[in-house]
From Swiss-Prot:
Enzyme active site: C154
Gene source species: Vibrio cholerae serotype O1 (strain ATCC 39315 / El Tor Inaba N16961)
Localization of this protein: Cytoplasm
Pathway recorded for this protein: Amino-acid biosynthesis; L-arginine biosynthesis; N(2)-acetyl-L-ornithine from L-glutamate: step 3/4
Protein's recorded name: N-acetyl-gamma-glutamyl-phosphate reductase
Keywords (A to Z) from UniProt: Amino-acid biosynthesis, Arginine biosynthesis, Cytoplasm, NADP, Oxidoreductase
């Protein structure tokens, strides 16, 4: 049994991870932690998240001594803020822990990226270079061998799973950048109360226009520029991404279908919709649903995921399963 610790356990993704660790036959939950100054320190996880009552009654502890915690675990999930993961990941790695980081602190291998999009200067270039990007369906071989997995972001997961099969097969005319319009549930903003996620204030609206940090993450890992506009939806969870692309000259609908089939024929967590995907079919699941329509030289691909699961926690667990050679669906379905 792999002793598994979750840092940032009080948040939505932390609670989802705790449930998956509880279900996993090869993992045992060794600790739940939050920052030293968190108001949640000392409370049980069941107090914070009623859905785990009767399953996980372990207290959420303040993280005050990283070395001691590291000595008592094999695996660490970091469901923490970007700058916190930036500081913690190298400490756990130095103690020989396997790290799965759900923040953006190690996703893009460019130090110049971080001051612009995350507001801090990256101090760990050696781990930035070694970290493997945790887009499970596309990076499995690298995930198997790396001690540091930077789990892909929520919007980037929904977007890349929709675009990569066509891009890899050369079916897209990239002189016309793919246009991604995506809507996320309010849980993507986290659990902390703000005006943005207040019940009476939430409305369908765009944000981060031309400057959202996920745009360069998507573009970097696709290898082509994109136009990305995120929207806040007035619902709890899920992401729906609608992506418009120009097909290369002469590309047929059959070639499109074959590209998707080839990319995901042995990937159990990507499903093809009979029509076009909808959030209600993927919320509370680890799946990504894809559907598309072709008209002339243009294609619209629609992608739906649960932002807290395939966009965060379940993809992290999927990466763990891949890394250790467990069945990919273990603890996920």
């Amino acid at each position: 049994m792999l002793k598994t610790t979750i840092i940032g356990a009080s948040g939505y993704t932390g609670a989802e991870l705790a449930l998956m660790v509880h279900k996993h036959p090869q993992l045992t939950l060794s600790g739940l932690y939050v920052s030293a100054n968190s108001v949640d320190a000392g409370k049980s996880l069941a107090q914070l998240h009623g859905r785990v009552a009767g399953l996980i009654d372990m207290p959420v502890q303040a993280l005050t001594d990283v070395d001691t915690v590291a000595a008592e675990c094999d695996v660490v999930f970091l469901a923490t803020a970007h700058e916190v993961s930036h500081d913690l990941a190298p400490q756990f790695l130095a103690q020989g822990c396997q790290v799965f980081d759900l923040s953006g602190a190690f996703r893009v291998q460019s130090e110049a990226f971080y001051p612009t999009f995350y507001g801090f200067a990256h101090q760990h270039s050696e781990w930035l270079e070694k970290a493997v990007y945790g887009l499970a369906e596309w990076n499995a071989e690298a995930i198997k061998t790396s001690p540091m997995i930077a789990v892909a972001g929520c919007y980037p997961t929904a977007s890349q799973l929709a675009i990569k099969p066509l891009l890899v097969d050369g079916l897209i005319d990239t002189t016309q950048w793919p246009v991604i319009n995506a809507v996320s549930g309010v849980s993507g903003a986290g659990r902390k109360a703000t005006m943005t996620n207040s019940f009476c204030e939430v409305s369908l609206q765009p944000y981060g226009v031309f400057n959202h940090r996920h745009q360069p993450e998507i573009a970097t890992h696709l290898g082509c520029e994109v136009i990305f506009t995120p929207h806040l939806g007035n619902f709890k969870r899920g992401i729906l991404a609608t992506i418009t692309m120009k097909l290369a000259d002469g590309v047929t609908e059959q070639q499109v279908a074959e590209a998707f089939s080839k990319a995901y024929q042995d990937k159990p967590l990507v499903r093809f919709s009979n029509g076009l995907p909808r959030i209600q079919d993927v919320e509370f699941t680890p799946f990504c649903d894809l559907g598309w329509k072709v008209q002339g030289r243009h294609i619209i691909v629609v992608s739906a995921i649960d932002n807290l699961l395939k966009g965060a926690s379940s993809q992290a667990m999927q990466c763990l399963n891949i890394h250790y050679g467990f069945d990919e669906l273990t603890a996920l379905v």
